[in-house]
Regions:
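Conserved alpha/beta catalytic core and glycan-binding cleft of carbohydrate-active enzymes
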Residues: 1-110, 116, 120, 169, ...
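Carbohydrate-interacting/catalytic domains
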Residues: 81-84, 95-103, 107-109, 113-244
């Protein structure tokens, strides 16, 4: 349990599912969405890891195409705004999942390597970080900082034991395009609604709660009464909290 492993199952399942825009069935439990978001410790079927510290959750690292480029390569007709939204969603899911998050430099400002998949032997103009992108992505970066800070402060997003994850986490698909991911422990509950489709969805929250995250807004603390209808735009997510 002291060693971590880059979770290719997380990487591939997230990217392929977001490209498809709908739920994808797999014969391998390690690729099940309920498992990849819960560090693959056996929420559904056999465990791939024994403890969450073993699961390095990522969608981008030094090899292969950047996430931003991946969506263009896989979906040539993709619009820029959709490409950005999918890239954000992939990155945010890394931070919402159990396990150890790994963020590659430049993901927060849609890093591109000119659609090249492997650039180890290519010049600096492809491998360098374009720092001018920072000024163009202030909203995305500010939101990401708040999400990272919230993850660090919220134990429910950082459960330490595999058994805790199996006991307290749950994921259900509401349709082929939407799922609800919950973590509930000691009268505290996080509900994360995710829309991977290209159409807006609505959801009725069954309990009184607080809306904390709804991109591009963070730390909202908006009271949501029981039964209120919530709208969730395409390729986005929201986080609700119940408890003290």
């Amino acid at each position: 349990p002291a060693f971590g492993f880059f979770s290719d199952n997380f990487r591939d399942t997230i990217k392929r599912t977001l490209v498809a825009g709908h739920r994808r069935e797999s014969q391998h439990p390690a690729n099940d969405f309920a498992n990849i978001l819960t560090a693959n410790v056996g929420k559904v079927g056999p465990a791939h890891f024994t403890q969450p510290q073993q699961a390095i959750q990522y969608v981008e690292c030094h090899d292969n195409a950047t996430v931003f480029d991946y969506f263009q390569l896989e979906k040539e007709e993709i619009r820029l705004e959709e490409r950005k939204a999918l890239s954000r969603l992939a990155l945010h899911l890394v931070l919402l999942a159990q396990g150890v998050p790994f963020i590659h430099a430049g993901q927060e400002f849609y890093r591109t390597k000119g659609l090249e998949e492997n650039t180890y032997n290519l010049p600096d103009n492809l491998n360098q970080l374009d720092w001018t992108s920072l000024s163009k992505c202030k909203e995305e970066i500010a939101f990401l900082k708040e999400l990272i800070a919230y993850r660090k402060s919220q134990p429910l997003l950082r459960l330490r034991k595999g058994q805790e994850i199996r006991d307290y986490c749950d994921l259900k698909w509401l349709s082929d395009h939407h799922f609800i991911y919950t973590i509930e422990k000691d009268r505290k509950k996080i509900t994360i609604l995710v829309n991977i489709g290209d159409q807006e969805m609505t959801y009725h929250q069954p309990n009184d709660s607080q809306l904390l995250f709804a991109y591009p807004q963070a730390k909202l603390q908006t009271s949501i009464p029981k039964g209120k209808e919530l709208s969730l735009s395409a390729h986005s997510w929201i986080l609700l909290y119940e408890g003290d």
